[in-house]
Amino acid sequence: MSEINHRYLKDNDGNRYFPVTHVDAIRGLESLIKDSGWVEFTPVNGKPNQAFKDNDDKGYNCSYRTIEFLDVKIKTVRLNLSDISYGMTIYNFPDDFAKESQSWLVRTPANRLPVTISLRPSGKLSLSMNYIDRDDWVENNYIYGSFTWIE
């Protein structure tokens, strides 16, 4: 096997160094990245919840975020909601907010099974729960969680 020829740059004292760049040294980088920041939304059903909102918990409200870099989109939905019911619509995003259907599990109280959240290309964000929990879910039971996907 042959050796690959390396060239090292040397500083003024003759010491080798590896040149790298810093994000601040790239002109126009801001124009390549678009960030919506966290956009809070009011659920159409259910109630915004206060779970995990103590100073130490640093919990969040129902919100979403989109970050675009070149042709890549990173999307996140965060939920903190109580007073929910089986099959209810949580929110209606614009059409194509999600190009493909997305589903994920979120946290619930310890005496409940996880709840499945579904987001459809139509923009409908809804939930479903296990049949064991459907009839006796109480107002102060909550869902809490976030989900991120790449398009």
Feature-to-residue mapping (PLM):
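Acidic surface patches and DE-rich sequence motifs
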Residues: D11, P43, F69, T108, ...
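Hydrophobic residues embedded in beta-strands of well-ordered beta-sheets
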Residues: R16, L70-K75, G123-S126
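Extracellular jelly-roll beta-sandwich "head" domains, especially the C-terminal globular C1q domain
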Residues: I84-M88, S101, L105-E151
